[in-house]
Amino acid sequence: MKRMVFSMVLAFVTMVVYSQDIKGKWITEAGDAQVEIYESNGKWNGKIVWLQKGPDTKDTHNSNEKLRSRKLMGVNILFGLTKKKDKWEGGRIYNPKNGKDYKCSMWMDGDKLKVRGHLGIFYETQTWKRAQ
C-alpha cells in the first residue's frame, strides 16, 4: 500500500514539474511548425525542428536579403529569454512569416505555452501545445 501511494505521489509531482518546464518540442498555434526550446548558458532559445511545408522551406521574408536563401529548418526563432518567477522574458522572437523580430515573453498556462510578441504597446499572444 505504501509503495502504491508513493508511486502515485511521485507520478503527480513529476507531472506538475514537467508541466511547468518549457524545455522540449512545441507545436505552434497554426500547427504549421514545431519549435524545440532549450536552455544554453542560462538563456532560453528555440529552433525550428519541423515545418509543414517541408525541410527545404526558405526564409524568404527575412529583412536581410542575404538570409532569404537559408533554410528555416534549424533556425533559432526564440532567443535570449531569462526565467523570472513563472515567466520567461527579456528575449526576442523571430516571425519567419513577415521576416521581423519582436520582444518576447512566455509563460505556462496549464499544459500550454503562451508565447507573446511585443512591439511597443502592441502585442500578439499565441498558444503552443507540447508535441508528443
Q: Model-predicted segments: where are they?
A:
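N-terminal helix-cap/turn-to-beta initiation motif at the start of protein domains
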Residues: 17-25, 123
